[in-house]
Swiss-Prot record:
<feature type="modified residue" description="Phosphoserine">
    <location>
        <position position="2"/>
    </location>
</feature>
<feature type="modified residue" description="N-acetylserine">
    <location>
        <position position="2"/>
    </location>
</feature>
<keyword id="KW-0106">Calcium</keyword>
<keyword id="KW-0677">Repeat</keyword>
<keyword id="KW-0479">Metal-binding</keyword>
<dbReference type="InterPro" id="IPR011992">
    <property type="entry name" value="EF-hand-dom_pair"/>
</dbReference>
<dbReference type="GO" id="GO:0005737">
    <property type="term" value="C:cytoplasm"/>
</dbReference>
<keyword id="KW-0009">Actin-binding</keyword>
<dbReference type="InterPro" id="IPR049025">
    <property type="entry name" value="AIF-1_EF_pair"/>
</dbReference>
<dbReference type="GO" id="GO:0015629">
    <property type="term" value="C:actin cytoskeleton"/>
</dbReference>
<keyword id="KW-0966">Cell projection</keyword>
<feature type="binding site">
    <location>
        <position position="64"/>
    </location>
    <ligand>
        <name>Ca(2+)</name>
    </ligand>
</feature>
<keyword id="KW-0597">Phosphoprotein</keyword>
<keyword id="KW-0206">Cytoskeleton</keyword>
<protein>
    <recommendedName>
        <fullName>Allograft inflammatory factor 1-like</fullName>
    </recommendedName>
</protein>
<keyword id="KW-0963">Cytoplasm</keyword>
<comment type="subunit">
    <text>Homodimer (Potential). Monomer.</text>
</comment>
Length: 150
């Protein structure tokens, strides 16, 4: 049992191989988008697809090629916009068209390149700006008295 368990959660070489395999799969999907006539007029498509692939791999926590509810929750918290369980379910439903409980890479790229207004798309676009504009305070919090509390 401990041998099975250690193989499932092993890092190092096995994790590197897993990530390399995932990257090849996503690169193959990117090639499909590059060959698709529907996206031929998209500006800077190769650069965008590369950026989308990196973000997707960062938030695909279980390395199964899908962003599930917990991965989305972590992504939103990391971006500084935590959402409720219900809001995240609605986001996933909007991105997948209500077909799935997880966001596949194809759904993710379609959402990012599509004309639909998705909350997730806006968050991903402005991720860098939001993090730069609100630096986290350092040191202990300032002292407050009871009169200053709401």
């Amino acid at each position: 049992m401990s041998g099975e368990l250690s193989n499932r959660f092993q890092g190092g070489k096995a994790f590197g191989l897993l990530k390399a395999r995932q990257e090849r799969r996503l690169a193959e999907i990117n090639r499909e988008f590059l060959c698709d006539q529907k996206y031929s007029d998209e500006e800077n498509l190769p650069e965008k697809l590369t950026a989308f692939k990196e973000k997707y791999m960062e938030f695909d926590l279980n390395n199964e090629g899908e962003i599930d509810l917990m991965s989305l929750k972590r992504m939103m918290e990391k971006l500084g916009v935590p959402k409720t369980h219900l809001e995240m379910k609605k986001m996933i439903s909007e991105v997948t068209g209500g077909v799935s409980d997880t966001i596949s890479y194809r759904d993710f790229v379609n959402m990012m390149l599509g004309k639909r207004s998705a909350v997730l798309k806006l968050v991903m676009m402005f991720e860098g700006k939001a993090n730069e504009s609100s630096p986290k305070p350092v040191g202990p919090p300032p002292e407050r008295d009871i009169a200053s509390l709401p």
